[in-house]
A protein has these predicted regions:
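Long hydrophobic alpha-helical segments that form multi-pass transmembrane helix bundles
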Residues: 146-229
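Active-site-adjacent bridging/hinge elements
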Residues: 48-57, 111-115, 188-197
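Specific transmembrane alpha-helix
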Residues: 73-89, 127-139, 208-230
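N-terminal signal-anchor module of multipass membrane proteins
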Residues: 2-96, 100
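Transmembrane alpha-helical segments and their boundary/interface "anchor" motifs
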Residues: 70-75, 88-119, 123, 127-137, ...
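Hydrophobic transmembrane-helix microenvironments that flank and shape a buried ionizable site
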Residues: 13-16, 27, 67, 104, ...
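Active-site-adjacent structural elements in folded domains
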Residues: 120-123, 202-209, 235-236
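Transmembrane helix-loop junctions in multipass membrane proteins, especially transporters and channels
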Residues: 38-42, 90-92, 164, 168-172, ...
Length: 237
């Protein structure tokens, strides 16, 4: 294998390490119910109980406060963005932009399909969100950094406006109900969506519009890869 081919295919250690840490964090956060709850009953009355409760609080999600658990999914999506940009640049050496985009669409659409297949009743979990966020990012993957930054903020601002000024926020934050006073109320726009009963069944990770916020971290990941590839450590930090 010649040096050019090696340069094209070699792993980037720091990206792999960051991805590995994110996966470890996901395992830790999702292991609470399986491993840590039995330990809590064992430690009752012990001097270690308070420290253990503080630990389990940090690996749990809460409606209020920001914990360690809340850092893991955004970090993983960030790393996905780094990998997406790397894949675009490497594939672009031998493929046209149209072919490159087609390959990315296929990859992220497959993630969405796999997510829909395995998350029955919990559609908006990790794979689905990553797939949809990736699809949103594909038109922007080759744009200038400034364009990607503006698009990232535009997506998250649009999502926050919908969340704050429509009944979507009520649905997302309060158990899947669009109205606090009328549990049966469903907005007209939602009723017009095919299969809305399934799509709006669980308000997980922001629901159907959640990828509008997740794509911000993914696009920031593409920017981080550009800085890393430029080997400018001061800028990267």
């Amino acid at each position: 294998m010649n040096s050019a081919a090696t340069e094209t295919t070699k792993r980037i250690v720091c990206v792999d390490q960051l991805r590995g840490y994110a996966i470890f964090g996901m395992l830790l956060v999702n292991a609470k119910g399986l491993f840590f709850e039995p330990v809590e009953s064992y430690l009752k009355g012990s001097n270690f109980l308070a420290a253990f409760e503080a630990f389990t609080y940090q690996i749990s999600h809460h409606q209020e406060n920001f914990t360690y658990a809340d850092t893991i999914a955004p970090l993983f999506v960030f790393v996905v963005g780094m990998g997406m940009r790397l894949s675009w640049l490497r594939r672009g050496r031998n493929a046209s932009p149209a072919e490159n985009r087609k390959a990315l669409v296929k990859r992220y659409f497959m993630l969405v399909l796999i997510g829909f297949a395995i998350y029955s009743g919990w559609l908006w979990d990790a794979l689905t969100d990553i797939g949809l966020a990736g699809l949103l990012a594909i038109p922007l993957i080759d744009k200038k950094p400034r364009t990607r930054i503006l698009a990232a903020f535009a997506f998250v601002i649009a999502y926050q406006c919908i969340h704050s000024f429509t009944s979507y926020g009520q649905w997302s934050m309060h158990g899947g109900k669009f109205s606090a006073t009328d549990p049966e109320y469903i907005p007209l726009l939602v009723r017009l969506v095919p299969l809305h009963d399934a799509l709006f069944q669980v308000p997980l990770n922001g629901g159907p519009l959640g990828p509008m916020s997740w794509v911000m971290m993914l696009l920031f990941g593409t920017l981080a890869y550009d800085l890393l590839a430029a080997k400018n450590e001061n800028k990267f930090i």
